[in-house]
């Protein structure tokens, strides 16, 4: 529904469209005013660090850039809830770290509820306020942990948090 946004493991972009056209896709389907939407597209491209790439075909982008397009495409629609299914799993370490910081920044600035699915314990600790460990078959919540590290990540560099004794012992 329109109250939910989704960011998949792979960008799930329309390769035949440009970056701007991909970001604008949801608004176009809602038949929003094109003059107003282009301004929003440009704003979101700047937020995700892709200013100047609007006319670039998405197949020419790196994996990290494609994920940022997917994130902007989700967020431009202003969903109440953002579902992220391993969106950073296929990225190299440096790009992944940048994207983790970006997700925290967007969370802080928008106040959106984000449900992030990841197999990376470190990523879950860094980005989550709460961590749910799932039990196998049937899938159900096995354990819940409340975490302080996402709030810390809004103030400190993520690399510094990883050096924190509490982070290390929790991990």
Where are these regions (language model features)?
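Short coil-to-helix segment of the ABC ATPase nucleotide-binding domain corresponding to the Q-loop/switch region
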Residues: 17-24
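Conserved signature/switch motifs of ABC ATPase nucleotide-binding domains
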Residues: 56-59, 77
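Catalytic Walker B motif of ABC-type/P-loop ATPase nucleotide-binding domains
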Residues: 82-85
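Helical segment within the ABC ATPase nucleotide-binding domain
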Residues: 96-110
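Conserved H-loop
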Residues: 111-117
């Amino acid at each position: 529904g329109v109250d939910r946004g989704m960011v998949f493991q792979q960008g799930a972009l329309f390769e035949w469209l440009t970056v701007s056209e991909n970001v604008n896709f949801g608004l176009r389907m809602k038949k929003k005013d094109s003059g107003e939407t282009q301004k929003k597209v440009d704003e979101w491209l700047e937020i995700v660090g892709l200013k100047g790439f609007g006319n670039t075909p998405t197949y020419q982008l790196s994996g990290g850039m494609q994920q940022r397009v997917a994130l902007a495409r989700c967020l431009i629609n202003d969903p109440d809830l953002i579902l992220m299914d391993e969106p950073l799993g296929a990225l190299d370490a440096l790009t992944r770290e940048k994207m983790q910081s970006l997700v925290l920044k967007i969370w802080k600035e928008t106040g959106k509820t984000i449900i992030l699915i990841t197999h990376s314990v470190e990523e879950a600790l860094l980005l989550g306020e709460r961590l749910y460990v799932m039990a196998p078959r049937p899938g159900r919540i096995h354990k819940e942990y409340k975490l302080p590290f996402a709030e810390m990540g809004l103030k400190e560099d993520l690399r510094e948090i990883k050096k924190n004794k509490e982070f290390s012992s929790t991990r």
